[in-house]
Amino acid sequence: MSLPTPSVQLYTLVEEFRADAARSLDRLAAIGLRHVEAFDFVGRPAEIRAALDASGLTAPTGHAPLLSDELWTPDGSIPTPEPEAVLEAAAIIGLTTVIDPFVEPVRWSTVDGVNEIADRLNAVADLAATYGLSVGYHNHAQEFLIDIDGRSALEHVVARTDERVAIELDLFWALTGGQDVPALVRRLGSRLLAVHVKDGFVPAENPFGVDADRTVTRHLDQRRPGEGEVPLVEAMRATDAVRWAVIEYDQSPGDVFDDIAASYAFLLEKGLAA
């Protein structure tokens, strides 16, 4: 059984990375990491690639919007770049898979909306192939608002999309969406390219419901792995398909680099990554 390779989503240290990308990457390398997951890279791909090369790190995966004309953030909606611009930047950095990190809950709340998401994923997979890239989707909790034909909307998208479309399962948000996370991991099977390794105590109500108050996502109770209620060990041992174990904190509970180091140590000590 091959083990996933550790990585870290750069959103975890978004402020530190924006302030000093080179120093941030050097600190990740000092922890022992060799890979990162890129974030907010479209506007400065050459700069990010240079910083990665200097630190000896690579970014095999990255987050960027591919399925939306504008993107929600805690500070308001922002316009998204054209898919071609995203893919060109990804190729410069050296990504192999570009993962869409968020599609608005309202689009996940109807069968037509979910089908449209799947169809756009198929179309962008075709486009990405012309750049030598693949695409994927990363969940929050809105992907579990409705069931279609007896399965979650996320799984409906998996069934409706080409095998080239990968899934990156955020284990914390899947639990927030009411899922039996290890069972979901098993059902996703070979489509599961990566997981976001994230622990904590999930909100009492899904903050990504159509009419939910999303400001609660500014105050999440996230913890180091093994200190929350997410069944990380069971979920990660439920499959051997996962290629990347991506450390992430939406809000780090302490010093961000210490927390990343603790997550990295957890993965190695539990035999969940190598």
Language-model segments: which ranges?
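N-terminal pre-domain/capping segments
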Residues: M1-I93, L268-A274
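Hydrophobic faces of well-ordered beta-strands that scaffold small-molecule active sites
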Residues: P4-L10, V36-A38, A59-A64, V98-D100, ...
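Active-site acidic/histidine proton-transfer and metal-coordination neighborhood
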Residues: H35, P74-A166, R187, F257
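Short amphipathic alpha-helices and their capping/turn segments at secondary-structure boundaries
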Residues: P45-D53, E84-I92, N122-A125, D180-L193, ...
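Alpha-helix-loop-beta-strand connector modules within alpha/beta enzyme cores
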Residues: R49-S68, L121-A128, E155-D162, V230-A235
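Acidic/histidine-rich catalytic cores of soluble enzymes
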Residues: T130-E229
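C-terminal helical cap(s) of enzyme catalytic domains, especially alpha/beta-barrels
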Residues: D255-A274
